[in-house]
Amino acid sequence: MSGMIIRTPTRTKTKSFNGKQMDFTFPSPVRGSVDEHSLDNHRIVNETLSLKPQEDIEVSSQMLSDYTSSASNANTYSGNSSNGYYSFANISDNTTASPKLHNHNNMVSPILENTESSFQLQTVESLDPQRQRIRSTYEYGHMGSNQNLRQTREKSKTAESISTTIAQQTIPTADNISFDFSDISGYEDAVSNKSENKNHKPQNSVVKNQLRATSRAAISTNDSPSLSNVYMSSLINSSLESTRKTSTASSSVRSSRSSLKRSNAVRCKGGLLQYFTKLGIKIRKNCNKLRLVMRRKLFRFKKNSKSFSRSNSIRSGLEISKLPKVRHEKKLRQESSSIAPHTLHQKRTHGFNNKLHKSMSLKSLQPALVSETVPEINNNLHDILESKEKTADVPAATKTMKTTPSLRRTPSSIRRAASILTSNVATPKASANNRNSMIEYDTVENSRISSRNSSIKSKGRLVRSSGSVGLSSIARQPSIVVKNKVIPLSMSRFSIKEEIKEEEEESEESTSDYYVETEPVEAAPRTLAGPKSYAPENFRYGANVDDIKTLYKHYLSTVISRRIKMRLEMAQGEHSATNEPALTHQSTASLKDPIASVLTEYDSEGSEGTNLFDDEDDSSASEEDDEVVLPPLKGHNSTMSFVVQSPFTRQNSMASSSALLYLPVKRSLTLPIGMKIT
C-alpha cells in the first residue's frame, strides 16, 4: 500500500522551486534494481520527452499526465499544463525546453541506455555554431588515430563520471538550449561536397573512398552509435551545412526565401486590379497632357502662319517687346503666391470665406453703397479729359476700393446683435439707413411708412429691413427663436388688415337675432374726404384715419358688451326656471320683468348708437364747409369691469351679489360663463 503511494508522484500547486523536491528520486522498477543515476529525476524527464507517446505508454502517462501529453490528458491544450498543477519532474527551468523544439524529429534529448555491464552514451550536439566549429576541426584532425582510444576510455568510465558528464552535457541551459540527433546517412554526401569545394582536383576521389571505408567499418562494428560515431556524424552534418552555404554564395546571390507562396503574376499592393487601375489613370493623364500640347502647337502654328506675310524685322521686334511682359507676369504670379494667405486666420482676414457661410444682404446694403450726394454734370469737354488723364496717372496701388465688410454668421455675432437690440439709444445713421431701406410700393404706402418711421424714432428701436434671405435682416430687429425658426416681434408695428376683417366676420356671425348696420361707418371717410379744398392727402390719411379707427372700435366694444350682458342674464333666468319648475305664476312674471327691461334698454341704446352716425350724415349734408365735430367718448365705456362669482352661488345670484374679484378688463369675445359683467 505504501509502495503504491510512493510510485505515484504527488501534485503540488507550487509554480517555483520549493525545497526538498530537488532530491526526489523514483523507486526502482519491479524487474530489477537500478543504480541511483538511472533513477535521477532529470534523466527520466529527458528520456520521456525524447520518446514518442506510442513507444512507452506507461512512462508517458505517469510523467506527462499534467505536462505535455495532450492525447492522454484532456486538461492540456498546447503542450503546456493549463490547470496549474506541476509534477516533481517539472521543478527547475533546466528540465524544460520550448515546445517548438520538441515538434521536430531531429531535435530530441539524449537517451542513456542501461545494460548489464556498461553504459553506452548517445551524446548530443549543441546548435551553437562556435562549438560545432571547434569540435569539427578537432575531431576531423584526430579522427583516424584516436578513435579506438576514445572507445576504450568511454567504456572504462564509471557511473559517477558518466553522471557528471550527463549533468554537464544533457541538461539544457541558457547556452545549450536544444539537442540534435545526427544521422550517419548523410556522411558520404558531406565528404564529397567538402572535397569538391576545397580542391577541384582528381585526388578527392581517393579521400572519398577512404572516408566511405571508415564509415562502413564503424557502422558494422558498432550496432548502437558510440560517442565517436556520434561526433563523426555531427562533424559531417556541420561540414555539409558549410559546403551548402559556400556553394549557394559562390553560385548565385539569392534573396532569403519567403514562407508565402505567391504566383509569378505582377506583385503589387492590392493585386492586379489596383495595378491596372493605376496604370489606366497614368495613361489617361499622359493622353490629356499630350492632347493639350498638340492643341497648343497647332494653334500657335495657325497664329504664326497668319503673320508670315510680315517682314522679319517686325517679327523680331514683336518678340523682343513680348519678353519683358512675360517676365513681369511671372514676377506678379510669384508675388501673389507668396502673399496669398495660408492659415485659416489669414484667409478670414483677407476675405476668403473658408468654412463660414457669409451671406450679404444686398438689399439692406444698397443705401450704404449708393452715395447720398448727387454728382453734378460737367458739360465742359476739356475738364472731363483732364480728369481722365489725372486718374490714369495715379498708380494702381494708391487707388482704394471702398468695400463693405461681410457679415459673419457666428453665435457670438448673433448674441451681440441681440444685445444691441435691447438698447434704447438709436444713432441718426441707423435711422437714415432704415428710412432709405424701406420698400416703396406706391404713394399711399410711402406716406404710411414715413409716419411709422417717425413714431419708431422716438422709441429708439431698429426698423425691419427690406426682405432678404439672409439672417441679418431678421437679426437686426427684435425677434425670438422657436425650434430653430426666427420669428420677428416687430410685426405689430405694421398694419395688418386681416385682424379687422376677422373682427367684422365674428361680429356678423354672432348677430343671429339682432342686426347692426355698419354702412354709416364706411360712409364716414367719404364725408371727410368730400371737398378737395378742405385738406391735403396727407392730412386725410394721416390724422383722421386714427380717429375713425378709435370710433369704430368704441362702437364695436359697446355693441358686443351689451350683447354678452343680455345673453348671460337670459341664460341665468332660463337656468333658474329649469331648476325650480314648481314656481308660481307670480315668480315667473317677476323673472320676466327684468328680461323685458333689459331688452327695452338695449333697443334704446342701440337706437342711440345708430342715430349717432345718422346725425353725422345729416350735418355733413347740410354743412359741408364746416368742420365735423366728433362727440367725446364717455369715460365709463372705454374700460369695463366684471365681477367673478363662485359657481356654487349661481342659483342665488339674483338675491346676493357677493363679488369675489372686481377688476377692470378690456373687451374679449371669449368670456367664461361664471363672470358677470357690470
Curated annotation (Swiss-Prot):
Annotated segments matching region Disordered: 1-35, 138-167, 190-210, 242-261, 602-632
Subcellular location: Bud neck
Biased composition (Low complexity): 245-261
Compositional bias annotation for Polar residues: 9-19
Chief location bin: other
GO cellular component annotations of the record: cellular bud neck septin collar; cellular bud neck split septin rings; nuclear inner membrane; plasma membrane
Family: Belongs to the AIM44 family.
Name of the molecule in the record: Altered inheritance of mitochondria protein 44
